[in-house]
């Protein structure tokens, strides 16, 4: 039986090239690192093969020895990113409580956005243009969302929440996470950047909102950083960049990651 998974479809775009030797694999890896660097700097639509070749310090023709086009190279880079993120999520330790069950994966997601804002932006661009990668990305998101949905059902057995309802809740909360992190790290919203200065800050805020939405109570956090700061903002009716509030926030210690 032939492979029909999104990953198999992406691999088939590369065609047959003699790149199995250790030297060839090393050079191929260096080209992928160059693709990643250029994607971070200028994005997919502006990228040219000459940019990648210059970044890698190779001739343009050598790029085509390893990849048929930029689209294939980009898909491999982004697939590696998705695979690495999935592996890190699977390796997270068992959470001590319901809050950590939300906070830890959200922190990992926020750290990925901070480290690779260009690649995260590119995920949307390439998924729009390459059906194989769109399928891979949707598959990854769907698996993650269904895991959240199953967790919701387990935590509320007496509520008799159906699969469709739990999925709807999971997608809504997941979209909130993607939307905020995209605004902070991809669009570089200055107002949000003033308040949510680190991935730990972003993860705490998102986890607190998620926790309150699910359990209708405050999370059991001993030393909240951002949620305490937001409470100050609301009570004082001040903007996020008000010096007094900014000074208060800067003196707080981030939640341990």
Question: PLM features: residue spans?
Answer:
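Helix-turn-helix
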Residues: 30, 38-72, 76
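Amphipathic alpha-helical packing segments from all-alpha helical-bundle domains
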Residues: 122, 131-157, 167-183, 201-208
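Short hydrophobic clusters on alpha-helical segments that form packing/core surfaces
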Residues: 27, 31-39, 81, 85, ...
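Hydrophobic alpha-helical segments that form the core
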Residues: 3-8, 162-187, 196-213, 226-237
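N-terminal intrinsically disordered/low-complexity leader segments
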Residues: 1-26, 189, 218-257
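Short linear capping/connector segments at secondary-structure termini
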Residues: 91, 122-131, 190-191
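Hydrophobic alpha-helical connector segments
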Residues: 76, 90-118, 166-173, 203
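Alpha-helical DNA-contacting segments of helix-turn-helix folds
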Residues: 39, 67, 73-81, 127, ...
